[in-house]
Amino acid sequence: MIVNNTHVLTLPLYTTTTCHTHPHLYTDFTYAHGCYSIYHLKLTLLSDSTSLHGPSLTESVPNALTSLCTALASAVYTLCHLPITPIIIHILISISHSAVPNIV
């Protein structure tokens, strides 16, 4: 939306939750495994043609944010489905502590 001739990027947020079901190895039952939620951003960027000079950001910003969100969702999905997830999480926490020790 445009407020006082200023461009505002609106980001409504919604989620999608997915669960995978797998047959149990020793019984006829099926159980849910690997439930995860992906946060989606619906991107809207409006601009008037008089205030922007140079290339338009209307297409490049949403495309970049969509690519970033897709990559992040893919990384989270991969981490959640690896059998060695606790080791990877421990490594990531160790890296974050060494990079920024006073925050976490």
UniProtKB/Swiss-Prot annotation:
Q: Give the species.
A: Saccharomyces cerevisiae (strain ATCC 204508 / S288c)
Domain of life where this protein originates:
Eukaryota
- The identity of this protein, by name, is Putative uncharacterized protein YAL069W
